[in-house]
């Protein structure tokens, strides 16, 4: 389990946080969050660009995408600050339960190791996609300016974010400083998003591993006597209940984040889809396509992890059904007690656990709904242009 949260630890450290801090004050180096303060400072100029271009649908959509990205990045950073002690408490619970289960058998340690290795591969890929999108966002304005100058002998200054500054960016010094500020500030959007989203991914992956261990145990439980069978089952049920409690803690932390993520992702997809449909044959099309991909991946991670958690938690019902419970039962009240506990556990497991964003459940159906809603918004925007 050495790989637990390793990608997340290195990413969130760039914002000054230490996930494995011995005390609950995880934000040890606030000065590292200068990029977040920079995006907060540039926010009014992005808003000014939105208001300035409100009559031009194309420019308005471009500015609105930047505005929504900024809002989501600032919101996620504020949630990291607000929830950092809750995250520390959850991390301690995960590490303790992982240690306890790994000590009970090599097969349980293997389940946990496999889950963490797969999780870290997915989180590394997710982080790479976001960093590539950030690099493309920073480089593409220079590429467009170079092409424009080569073809027409003149280039208008462009920035990573559409901003309306009170100074003249046609002056080289002003432009260079504005460009560096915008490019640096954009990392204040990327790092909180990658950190928060991959932490969720890692938590859900390990919760699924705990549910798999509970299934493994209940399918293979055997007792020499009714008392021993009941004691073994009680330990399995305790693991399942502990996992459900941790699911509930995770859901309480992430409900507002998932709600904001899905709402803003729907708006971003509709505007980026509209911009891509207009500019797909131009250099801007590559930029918008990369952003569409990152936003879809971002929404997909929450839906995929939520779907997996629901499936694994509900599979405990079938594990009980497939278990050799009848081999450990005899006649009498103790036998009836075991049957009753098995039935109650099956009834509870039938519901599974659902990750929610207040008004909706994070699953693949919700992901399809987000994409369909975005497509309908694109049609509406095209009718206005």
Curated annotation (Swiss-Prot):
Extracellular-facing ranges: 55-62, 151-175, 277-284, 379-385
Coiled-coil stretches: none
GO cellular component: dendrite; dendrite membrane; membrane; plasma membrane
Membrane-spanning segments: 34-54, 63-83, 130-150, 176-196, 256-276, 285-305, 358-378
Keyword Membrane recorded: yes
Tissue expr: Expressed with Orco in 40 olfactory receptor neurons in a broad area across the antenna, including both anterior and posterior faces. This expression pattern matches the distribution of the small sensilla basiconica. Expression in the antenna is observed late in antennal development at 93 hours APF.
Superkingdom of the organism of origin: Eukaryota
Subcellular location per the Swiss-Prot or TrEMBL entry: Cell membrane
GO biological process, one term: signal transduction
Chain ranges on the Cytoplasmic side, renumbered to this chain: 1-33, 84-129, 197-255, 306-357
GO molecular function list: ionotropic olfactory receptor activity; odorant binding; olfactory receptor activity
Mode of membrane association: Multi-pass membrane protein
Keywords: Cell membrane, Membrane, Olfaction, Receptor, Sensory transduction, Transducer, Transmembrane, Transmembrane helix
Function: Odorant receptor which mediates acceptance or avoidance behavior, depending on its substrates. The odorant receptor repertoire encodes a large collection of odor stimuli that vary widely in identity, intensity, and duration. Complexes with Orco to form odorant-sensing units, providing sensitive and prolonged odorant signaling and calcium permeability. They are necessary and sufficient to promote functional reconstitution of odor-evoked signaling in sensory neurons that normally respond only to carbon dioxide. Involved in the behavioral responses to esters.
Additional comment: The atypical heteromeric and topological design of the odorant receptors appears to be an insect-specific solution for odor recognition, making the OR/Orco complex an attractive target for the development of highly selective insect repellents to disrupt olfactory-mediated host-seeking behaviors of insect disease vectors. Odor-evoked OR currents are independent of known G-protein-coupled second messenger pathways.
Subunit structure: Interacts with Orco. Complexes exist early in the endomembrane system in olfactory sensory neurons (OSNs), coupling these complexes to the conserved ciliary trafficking pathway.
Family statement: Belongs to the insect chemoreceptor superfamily. Heteromeric odorant receptor channel (TC 1.A.69) family. Or1a subfamily.
Protein name, as recorded: Odorant receptor 47a
Organism: Drosophila melanogaster (Fruit fly)
Gene: Or47a
């Amino acid at each position: 389990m050495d790989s637990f949260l390793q990608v997340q630890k290195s990413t969130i450290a760039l914002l000054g946080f230490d996930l494995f801090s011995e005390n609950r004050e995880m934000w040890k180096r606030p000065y590292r969050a200068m990029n977040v303060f920079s995006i907060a400072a540039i926010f009014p100029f992005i808003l000014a660009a939105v208001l300035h271009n409100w009559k031009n649908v194309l420019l308005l959509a471009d500015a609105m995408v930047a505005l929504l990205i900024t809002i989501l990045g600032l919101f996620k950073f504020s949630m990291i600050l607000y929830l950092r002690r809750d995250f520390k408490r959850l991390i301690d619970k995960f590490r303790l339960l992982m240690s306890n289960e790994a000590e009970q058998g090599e097969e349980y340690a293997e389940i946990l190791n496999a889950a963490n290795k797969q999780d870290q591969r997915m989180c590394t890929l997710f982080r790479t996609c976001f960093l590539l999108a950030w690099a493309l966002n920073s480089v593409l304005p220079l590429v467009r300016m170079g092409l424009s100058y080569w073809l027409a002998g003149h280039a208008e200054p462009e920035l990573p974010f559409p901003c309306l500054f009170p100074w003249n960016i046609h002056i080289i010094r002003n432009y260079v400083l504005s460009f560096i500020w915008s490019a640096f500030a954009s990392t204040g959007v990327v790092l909180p998003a990658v950190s928060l989203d991959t932490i969720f991914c890692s938590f859900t992956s390990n919760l699924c591993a705990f549910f798999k261990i509970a299934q493994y145990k209940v399918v293979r439980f055997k007792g020499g006597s009714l008392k021993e069978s009941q004691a073994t089952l009680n330990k399995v049920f305790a693991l399942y209940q502990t996992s459900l409690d941790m699911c509930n803690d995770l859901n309480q932390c992430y409900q507002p984040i998932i709600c904001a993520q899905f709402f803003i992702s729907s708006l971003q997809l509709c505007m980026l889809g509209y911009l891509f449909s207009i500019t797909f044959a131009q250099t801007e099309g590559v930029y918008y396509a990369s952003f569409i991909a990152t936003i879809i991946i971002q929404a997909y991670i929450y839906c995929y992890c939520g779907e997996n958690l629901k499936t694994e938690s509900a599979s405990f019902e079938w594990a009980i059904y497939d278990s050799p419970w009848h081999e450990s039962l005899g006649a009498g009240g103790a036998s009836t007690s075991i049957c009753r506990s098995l039935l109650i556990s099956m009834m509870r497991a039938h519901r599974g656990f659902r990750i929610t964003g207040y008004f909706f459940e994070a699953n693949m159906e919700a992901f399809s709904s987000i994409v369909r809603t975005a497509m309908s918004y694109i049609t509406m925007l095209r009718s206005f242009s």
